Each structure stands twice: as C-alpha cells, then as structure tokens.
Amino acid sequence: MKHTKKSHNGFTLIELIIVMVILGIMAAVAVPRYLDSISNAEEAAEDAVISSIRAGLTQYANNSLYSSGRAEWPTNPFDALSEKPAGYSTDATDADIDGEWTFSNSRITHQRADNSRFAWDYDEGTQGGGDDAKIGSLGPRTAIVQAQ
C-alpha cells in the first residue's frame, strides 16, 4: 500500500503576520517621506513665485527710473508681473483657499494644499525724488499661525 503525502499549498498564519509587519514598517517610513516631498514641492513653487515677483519688481523699478528718473515699486507687487501666478486673487483678505495667492495690508499670502499659510511682508518704499526716497523691500517667508 502506497501512502501519498498531502501537499498543503498556501501561507501559514506566521508568514502572513510577518508580511503584514514588514508592510507596516514600510508604510511608516514611506508616508512621512511622501508628505515631506509634497511640502518641499509646495515650498519650491512658492520660492519660484517670489523669485518671479522679485525679478518683476527690479524690472518695474528700472522702467520707472528710465521713464521718471525715480526707481519706484508698485503698490501691489503682483502688478510688477506680466503674468499673475495661478491662484492669484484680488480678494482683500489673506489667502483662505488651497493654492490661493493674495495681497492685502502690505502682505503677500499663500495657502498650501495642507491649509498652512505663509506670508511675505512687502513695503513699496518711499516714493519721490528727495532724500527721503527709499526702495521697497520684500521680506522672508513667515508662517501664519491660525487660530483654533
């Protein structure tokens, strides 16, 4: 009499648990890196817009100097751009929609997709040709703390 050995195909419970643990560890490492990459991408996009504004302000001041003899910056820094950034709004409040850029009360604001907001202080400077004239300034990025 010949005995045949039954073959059990499949995974044991231990093997399945080990796979789940490995997947959990991979997810714990990958998700924060993914979120960081999104934040870094949004920061890079903001930097590109602000660099564009700085270049536009320089061009605006040069054109003003050529035409009037005075280097002036516009009241609204977005007016120095030939093309406004995607999401630009003339809304008089701080940005409150994902991807929105606004300018009000001497402050440029941008809201990211994660609802965090950032601002850059803007000063157009003192206009005029006298000794009190000064060129404007565009400050660094600062986080806006939102009230809970």
Task: Describe each region flagged by the PLM.
Residues 1-11:
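N-terminal leader/signal peptides at the extreme start of proteins
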Residues 8, 22-25, 54:
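Short glycine/serine/threonine-biased micro-segments
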Residues 17-33:
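Alpha-helical hydrophobic helix detector
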Residues 39-67:
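Membrane-proximal N-terminal amphipathic helix
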Residues 62-118:
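Extracellular/periplasmic head regions of type IV pilus-like filament subunits
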Residues 109-148:
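Short, surface-exposed interaction loops/tails
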